[in-house]
């Protein structure tokens, strides 16, 4: 057939002639958990290089905050990591209180701690459910979302809003919670949460397929985790028991007893299991908060920062004027700078606040959790299959409102 036609063996399409090719993962990919674009270089189905492109959800939050009073800037934090809004508010209000040298009443500290842990459970339900669904299991996601819905209902009963609650305020919390809500949270933590969550996890934890998709995927050593600036479940999954609630306790965490779950292999499965165990530890903290919850005021008595009560405004003209001035002009914060980090559900969330003595922040630098985790995508993905990308991103737990700011 080829008689008389010389065959150029050097350029024959074969194994030698196949070159690496580049694909775009996202920014519309359902497993990207937001607007993540990754330019991936593949050798067949093996990942050779990953170049994450972030910033597609950048809204200029840090600059917008400079044009708002300290209280008006608070709702911006709800909209950073919108899966765990109270975790974002926490760092910001603590930073303001540190600059003001403001004392927060014990009841407010316990309420904050309790709702911060409810937020952690709420966040982990979303991550665990979507991670499991990304690798092919549907049922557990539907079950854990029922628990997430319960958490959102608790937020609504406390603040009036399911997600963007703006419940933590400089000096304490916005309003006290009904006694019935505390009773319901106590019953939920004792009965519904362990039952439903235990049932959902029984389908996943020892599942052969789930383990094959996650064990030994994106292994990160202790040294690498430190070098890349990991925090939260990412660094604990690599075997380092670093938790700001223990090492630098804030609010009521110093009085709480809980364990820090850590992984042994530093792979996707360990990071998943750290979050599963954190749900049980959060439940333990919530029980302690409910047991030891003191009575008393829910906000500081410093009237230069905290507005008067609604009842006072209906009887006193001075209180009404005071309220109006606080919400229009805001309060003045002494000049200085402060960095406050809290253990948000995804890792260390920090706020660096610079005050020039006016009623608006001079500068507010936000230290997101996912930014330092995403920069390690290339290191974690190299040598794995394309299909493993979904498991790796799922185990990072990234939300782009917070990452891109």
Swiss-Prot record:
What Pfam families does the record tag this protein with?
Answer: Complex1_49kDa
This enzyme catalyses: a quinone + NADH + 5 H(+)(in) = a quinol + NAD(+) + 4 H(+)(out)
A GO term from the CC aspect:
plasma membrane
| SUPFAM superfamilies, A to Z | HydB/Nqo4-like
Q: Which InterPro entries match?
A: NADH_Q_OxRdtase_suD, NADH_UbQ_OxRdtase_49kDa_CS, NDH1_su_D/H, NiFe-Hase_large
Q: Which domain of life is it from?
A: Bacteria
Any GO MF annotation of the entry:
NAD binding
Q: What class of enzyme is it?
A: translocase
Q: How does it sit in the membrane?
A: Peripheral membrane protein
Q: Which family does it belong to?
A: Belongs to the complex I 49 kDa subunit family.
- PANTHER family recorded for this chain? NADH DEHYDROGENASE [UBIQUINONE] IRON-SULFUR PROTEIN 2, MITOCHONDRIAL, NADH-UBIQUINONE OXIDOREDUCTASE 49 KDA SUBUNIT
Q: What does this protein do?
A: NDH-1 shuttles electrons from NADH, via FMN and iron-sulfur (Fe-S) centers, to quinones in the respiratory chain. The immediate electron acceptor for the enzyme in this species is believed to be ubiquinone. Couples the redox reaction to proton translocation (for every two electrons transferred, four hydrogen ions are translocated across the cytoplasmic membrane), and thus conserves the redox energy in a proton gradient.
Name of the protein this chain belongs to: NADH-quinone oxidoreductase subunit D
Question: To which species is this protein native?
Answer: Sphingopyxis alaskensis (strain DSM 13593 / LMG 18877 / RB2256) (Sphingomonas alaskensis)
The gene coding this protein: nuoD
């Amino acid at each position: 057939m080829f008689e008389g036609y010389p065959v150029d063996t050097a350029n024959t399409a074969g194994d030698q002639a196949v070159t690496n090719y580049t694909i775009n993962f996202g920014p519309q990919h359902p497993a990207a958990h937001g607007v993540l674009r990754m330019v991936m270089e593949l050798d067949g189905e093996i990942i050779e290089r990953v170049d994450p492109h972030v910033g597609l959800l950048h809204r200029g939050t840090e600059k917008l905050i400079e044009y708002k009073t300290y209280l008006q800037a608070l709702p911006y934090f709800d909209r950073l990591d919108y899966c765990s809004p109270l975790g974002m508010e926490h760092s910001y209000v603590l930073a303001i209180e540190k600059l003001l040298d403001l004392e927060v009443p014990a009841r407010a500290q316990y309420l904050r701690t309790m709702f911060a842990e409810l937020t952690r459970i709420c966040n982990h339900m979303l991550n665990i459910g979507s991670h499991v669904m990304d690798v092919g299991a549907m049922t557990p996601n539907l079950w854990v979302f029922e628990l997430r819905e319960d958490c959102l209902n608790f937020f609504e009963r406390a603040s009036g809003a399911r997600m963007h609650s703006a419940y933590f305020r400089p000096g304490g919390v916005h309003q006290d919670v009904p006694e019935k809500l505390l009773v319901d949270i106590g019953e939920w933590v004792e009965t519904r949460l362990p039952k439903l969550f235990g049932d959902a996890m029984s389908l996943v934890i020892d599942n052969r397929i789930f383990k094959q998709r996650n064990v030994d995927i994106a292994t990160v050593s202790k040294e690498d985790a430190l070098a890349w600036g990991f925090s939260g479940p990412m660094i604990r999954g690599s075997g380092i028991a670093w938790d700001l609630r223990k090492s630098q306790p804030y609010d009521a965490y110093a009085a709480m007893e809980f364990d820090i779950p850590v992984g042994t292999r530093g792979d996707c499965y360990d990071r998943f299991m750290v979050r599963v165990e954190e749900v049980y530890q959060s439940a333990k903290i919530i029980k302690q908060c409910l047991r030891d919850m003191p009575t008393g005021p829910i906000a500081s008595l410093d009237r230069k920062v905290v507005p008067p009560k609604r009842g006072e405004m209906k009887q006193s003209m001075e209180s009404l004027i005071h309220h109006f001035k606080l919400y229009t002009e805001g309060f003045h914060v002494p000049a200085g700078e402060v960095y406050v980090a809290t253990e948000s559900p995804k890792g260390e969330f920090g706020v660096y606040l610079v005050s020039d003595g006016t009623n608006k922040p001079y500068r507010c630098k936000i230290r997101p959790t996912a930014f330092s985790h995403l920069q390690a995508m290339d290191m974690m993905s190299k040598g794995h299959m394309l299909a493993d990308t979904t498991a790796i991103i799922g185990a990072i737990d990234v939300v782009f409102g917070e990452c891109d700011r």
